[in-house]
């Protein structure tokens, strides 16, 4: 479980900085199901690439002046340059990227949608026809011609340009944030850093230190304000946080929707197992004691590829609208960082929509219409041209009832099985949380609410979790979603958008043929509960702490028991699974998510939202999710690593915003000007992976931000 934090558009510098902000589902006319990408749009080079170009130009000037000088390899500088150029061209040709300026210009012309029909070869038309026939049959394939293919490409280019223009305007408004001196002083990856090439280069940017080396006094606040620790078990104080967020928290760009966090939701998120009361920080007006700002952190164990560490998720950064000129947000960030350091945690994860130094992953929001009529009435989605409301509603109809044998709500007796299934499934991703059984019970069951007498549903329910149990009593699948409504700020007819957000899911189809997937992975597990025996050490970290080791010295030690840790053994990575496993996974996930949509409809949700993390790309199109105009960027505080694929690239223009794509371009440039075999191999691998449609493989990001 991850947190959201953020503020409205005009919140000062660091209001976005350390906030984990999933913005409210914004109104979007692009709610229609996505079309498969037919071509790769030309990619804009980023500022870092421009810097590289300048450096390369300088190198070329030097080479001209020293062309006659022979090196140890017997070649002149000019000959070496020519050799490297040929090698780069060979690499590009091998990867299907085009080998000459002519190839590049042809690609740009085709991708622009303005090309004449003659620019589209018969081979391209045949390839598209075969792809369409495989998905939609021969009738649809026969309709593919050069003329309508050119029109489709033009439409895709319009979508790409509109999306990039929207993102560009937002980025200009946020440029002051990214350039602010605050980030220059923080242990975060910078655009000017050398790219991470080897695994041993991944890790902490700054070392952990003992508490006595951490600042002991709170950071100073402007006059008339004072710090306060919020007790979330105190109903009055929790209500104050709720009121502050309700009136001042994240809105969409058009100020039409605002998240409406319930007290039950806040209780569920903020009281994560192992939470620290000192990480729930508020600012009051000294004279009136009115709460005017808040920030919080949630403890989690985070795994990034092969390394795991204790971290904090920064959430709910909010400053009262009337006080945003006081620059409270940067001070809030520094204070919550100080409090985390005092308790021995020196790493964090946070998300925002804007680009800061430096995203480790980026994903896009998708929305699945449930109540089509209401969404159209409030401006959340648009009815396609020349389509009636009745036809629009019919597009999103779902089956009358679920049809999945063994489906039922999750119960506490399922925690051990669900925990094991989740740990195995999440181990597939490059970046993911590590949940103990205790945490699984909290995130999936503690938000169930209380049963309503004589009625369906539960009072204060936040989470809905379901499992699929086979005839042998084994849980083969699980999925969950949570409720996060948004207030509608400009509608006379509707006051609330009842939104469900896709949470975690897992299925055992990815472990076909794995003889260990159905049995305990360790002999220390209790046969009845599946948890570690009480006679065994609880976890590496717990043992170290019990032995007197300080918390700051235990950041790399796991909270998982030996039994739980063994659940992650021998699991293939998401991008190395064979095609037949991906096919089975796609089929199963489409069935599970379709079932989830029916349940969401039956509980009166208007829309189901998600981002392109986990394996979501495998079902988005078939389940009629449409792309929104929001993007969620993931950031790691005090951790250096290669970017993580966030499921971007299926839609026009997404590649330009993807950190993985930018990293691949950067490494390709570097590979063309180096003899380092490691760099060349990594560049080739990155470029090849970047060309794969995420709808075929999913993503490497296993984090769901709440």
From Swiss-Prot:
Residues 7-42 have a biased composition (Low complexity). Residues 78-95 have a biased composition (Basic residues). One of its GO terms (cellular component) is cytosol. GO terms for biological process: protein localization to membrane. Tetradecanoyl-CoA binds at residues 180-183, 317-319, 325-329. Residues 47-65 have a biased composition (Acidic residues). Its main location: cytoplasm. It is an enzyme of class 2 (transferase). Keywords: Acyltransferase, Cytoplasm, Transferase. It catalyses: N-terminal glycyl-[protein] + tetradecanoyl-CoA = N-tetradecanoylglycyl-[protein] + CoA + H(+). Residues 1-119 are annotated as: Disordered. Adds a myristoyl group to the N-terminal glycine residue of certain cellular proteins. This is Glycylpeptide N-tetradecanoyltransferase. It comes from Mycosarcoma maydis.
């Amino acid at each position: 479980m991850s947190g959201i934090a953020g503020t409205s558009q005009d919140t000062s510098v660091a209001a976005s900085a350390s906030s984990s902000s999933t913005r409210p589902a914004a109104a979007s006319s692009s709610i229609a199901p996505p079309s498969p990408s037919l071509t790769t749009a030309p990619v804009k080079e980023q500022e870092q690439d421009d810097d590289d170009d300048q450096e390369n130009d300088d190198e070329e000037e030097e080479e001209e002046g020293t062309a006659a000088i022979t090196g140890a390899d017997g070649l002149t500088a000019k000959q070496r340059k020519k050799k490297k150029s040929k090698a780069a061209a060979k690499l590009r040709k091998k990867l299907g990227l085009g080998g000459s300026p002519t190839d590049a210009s042809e690609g740009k012309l085709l991708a622009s949608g303005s090309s004449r029909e003659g620019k589209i070869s018969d081979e391209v038309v045949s390839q598209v026809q075969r792809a369409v026939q495989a998905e939609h049959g021969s009738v649809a394939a026969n309709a593919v011609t050069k003329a309508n293919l050119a029109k489709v490409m033009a439409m895709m280019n319009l979508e790409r340009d509109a999306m990039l223009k929207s993102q560009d305007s937002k980025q200009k408004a946020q440029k002051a944030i990214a350039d602010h001196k605050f980030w220059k002083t923080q242990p975060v990856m910078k655009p000017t850093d050398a790219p991470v090439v080897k695994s041993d280069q991944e890790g902490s940017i700054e070392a952990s230190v003992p508490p006595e080396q951490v600042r002991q006094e709170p950071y100073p606040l402007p006059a008339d304000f004072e710090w306060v620790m919020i007790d979330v078990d105190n109903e009055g104080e929790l209500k104050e946080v709720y009121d502050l967020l309700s009136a001042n928290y994240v809105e969409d760009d058009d100020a039409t929707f605002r998240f409406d966090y319930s007290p039950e939701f806040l209780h569920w998120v903020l009281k994560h197992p192992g939470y620290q009361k000192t990480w729930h920080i508020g600012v009051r007006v000294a004279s009136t004691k009115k709460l005017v700002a808040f920030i919080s952190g949630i403890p989690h164990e985070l795994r990034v590829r092969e390394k795991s560490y204790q971290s904090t998720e920064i959430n709910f950064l909010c400053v009262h609208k009337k006080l945003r000129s006081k620059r409270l947000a940067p001070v809030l960030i520094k204070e919550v960082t100080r409090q985390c350091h005092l308790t021995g945690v020196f790493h964090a994860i946070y998300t925002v929509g804007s680009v800061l130094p430096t995203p480790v992953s980026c994903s896009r929001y998708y929305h699945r219409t449930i109540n089509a009529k209401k969404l159209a009435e409030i401006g959340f989605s648009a009815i396609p041209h020349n389509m009636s409301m009745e036809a629009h509603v019919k597009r999103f109809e779902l089956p009358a009832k679920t049809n999945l044998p063994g489906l039922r709500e999750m119960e506490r007796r399922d925690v051990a099985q669900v925990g094991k299934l989740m740990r195995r499934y999440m181990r597939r991703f490059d970046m993911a949380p590590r949940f103990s059984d205790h945490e699984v019970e909290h995130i999936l069951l503690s938000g169930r609410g209380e049963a309503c007498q004589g009625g369906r549903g539960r009072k204060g329910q936040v989470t809905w979790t379901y499992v699929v149990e086979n005839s042998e009593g084994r849980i083969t699948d699980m999925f969950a979603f949570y409720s996060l409504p948004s207030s509608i700020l400009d509608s006379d007819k509707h006051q609330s958008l009842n939104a469900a957000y896709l949470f975690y899911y897992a299925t055992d189809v990815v472990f076909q043929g794995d003889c260990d997937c159905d049995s305990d992975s360790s002999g220390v597990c209790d046969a009845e509960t599946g948890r570690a025996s009480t006679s065994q050490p609880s976890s590496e970290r717990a043992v170290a702490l019990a032995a007197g080791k300080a918390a700051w010295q235990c950041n790399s030690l796991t909270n998982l028991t030996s039994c739980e840790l063994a659940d992650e053994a021998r699991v293939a990575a998401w991008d190395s699974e064979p095609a037949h496993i991906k096919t089975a996974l796609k089929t199963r996930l489409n069935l599970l998510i379709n079932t989830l949509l029916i349940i969401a409809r039956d509980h009166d949700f208007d829309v189901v939202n998600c981002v392109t993390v986990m394996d979501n790309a495998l079902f988005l199109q078939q389940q009629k999710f449409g792309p929104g105009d929001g993007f969620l960027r993931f950031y790691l505080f005090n951790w250096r690593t290669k970017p993580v694929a966030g499921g971007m690239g299926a839609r026009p223009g997404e590649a330009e915003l993807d950190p993985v794509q930018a990293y691949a371009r950067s490494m390709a440039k570097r590979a063309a000007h180096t003899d380092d075999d490691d760099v060349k191999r990594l560049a080739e691998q990155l470029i090849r992976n970047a060309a794969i449609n995420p709808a075929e493989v999913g993503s490497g990001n296993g984090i769901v931000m709440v």
